[in-house]
């Protein structure tokens, strides 16, 4: 009994000496204090056996694994620090900012699911206007680019009259202005950010009327070969007829007005997009017509040879353009035609 009392006094003395050390260790362990469970989940039997003597053996000096239960080992050796949700909020805000930038640059529709974490409701009336290719998709006919295209269309019959009356110099100047307007209407539309559905039909139609009128008048004056003019006119008629036929098949031959036929006032109007080979062909045709107009007043046998070469070039690009549109038509043919075939 005397030995037990002496050991107990020795333990109490050591406990007083080591109390500041354990207090400091516990304070530096973290800002959150955890209350250990009554029994250790990993060693329940071991904790139950030592529980009567734990108040005497825990504060002893020496290694921690000999004097502390498992949960106190974790608190003393590995401090716990709870991280706040500030970093998570910052990541969410950064994600929203990136998604907004992506939508503003690429104009992705919200139906694709690229929406921010915090909902942002934006309602757009699709029947009023639609933004495409950097400009407003407008249905109105009255605008500057369409007026330029209309002036080029009207210039075709005027140039026909000039060539028929052998006013070649005046016809050349008029053709130069009309040819420049083919570039000008597109430039003005881009500068004014006008994306007109009617203009997409009017621009190629004006080119065909201009070239057709001038070519027919030049055949009458023996300035161009009739075979070449026939190829050009047949190609234009085939393109216009094929486009109308394809549109009618898509509508199942049912429409009320021409506005419905061309879908000018629908939610997704169909524009006419010319191929690159067609634009190149138009440039070669205008160059040939301009050179042939000047041939009677300023030409010679050498220039006539160059006009012959250019005529063959125009015939080649005309047939190549026709073939390219045929391939495009075959790829975009209606589903009803695919089922029939």
Curated annotation (Swiss-Prot):
The keyword Membrane is annotated on this UniProt entry: yes
Pfam families reported for this sequence: CDP-OH_P_transf
Signal sequence segment: none
The keyword Lipid biosynthesis appears for this protein: yes
Mitochondrial intermembrane compartment residues: 328-341
Segment annotated as transit peptide: 1-28
Cofactor: Mn(2+)
InterPro entries: CDP-alcohol_PTase-I, CDP-OH_P_trans, CDP-OH_PTrfase_TM_dom, CDP_ALCOHOL_P_TRANSF_CS
EC number in record: 2.7.8.41
One MF term in the entry's GO annotations: cardiolipin synthase (CMP-forming)
Disulfide bonds: none
Spans through the membrane: 157-177, 197-217, 226-246, 307-327
Keywords per UniProt: Lipid biosynthesis, Lipid metabolism, Membrane, Mitochondrion, Mitochondrion inner membrane, Phospholipid biosynthesis, Phospholipid metabolism, Transferase, Transit peptide, Transmembrane, Transmembrane helix
Organism name: Arabidopsis thaliana (Mouse-ear cress)
Protein's UniProt name: Cardiolipin synthase (CMP-forming)
């Amino acid at each position: 009994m005397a030995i037990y009392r002496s050991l107990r006094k020795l333990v109490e003395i050591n406990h007083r000496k080591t109390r500041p050390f354990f207090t400091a260790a516990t304070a530096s362990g973290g800002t959150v204090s955890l209350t250990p469970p009554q029994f250790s989940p990993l060693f329940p039997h071991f904790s139950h056996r030592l529980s009567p003597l734990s108040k005497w053996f825990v504060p002893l000096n020496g290694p921690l694994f000999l004097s502390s239960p498992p949960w106190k080992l974790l608190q003393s050796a590995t401090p716990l620090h709870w991280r706040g949700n500030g970093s998570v909020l910052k990541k969410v805000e950064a994600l929203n900012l990136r998604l907004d930038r992506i939508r503003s640059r690429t104009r992705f529709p919200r139906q694709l699911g690229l929406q921010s974490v915090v909902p942002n409701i934006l309602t757009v009336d699709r029947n009023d206007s639609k933004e495409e290719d950097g400009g407003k998709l407008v249905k109105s006919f009255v605008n500057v680019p369409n007026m330029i295209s209309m002036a080029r269309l009207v210039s075709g019959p005027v140039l026909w009259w000039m060539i028929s009356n052998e006013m070649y110099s005046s016809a050349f100047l008029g053709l130069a202005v009309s040819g420049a307007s083919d570039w000008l209407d597109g430039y003005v539309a881009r500068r004014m950010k006008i994306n007109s559905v009617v203009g997409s039909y009017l621009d190629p139609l004006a080119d065909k009327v201009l070239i057709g009128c001038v070519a027919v008048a030049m055949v009458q004056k023996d300035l161009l070969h009739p075979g070449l003019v026939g190829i050009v006119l047949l190609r234009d008629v085939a393109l216009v007829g094929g486009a109308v036929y394809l549109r009618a098949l898509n509508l199942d031959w049912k429409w009320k007005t021409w506005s419905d036929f061309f879908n000018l006032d629908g939610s997704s109007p169909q524009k006419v997009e010319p191929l690159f080979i067609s634009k190149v062909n138009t440039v070669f045709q205008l160059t040939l017509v301009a050179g042939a107009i000047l041939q009677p007043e300023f030409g010679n046998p050498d220039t006539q040879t160059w006009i012959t070469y250019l005529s063959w070039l125009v015939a080649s690009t005309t047939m190549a353009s026709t073939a390219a549109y045929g391939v495009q038509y075959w790829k975009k043919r209606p589903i009803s035609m695919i089922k029939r075939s």
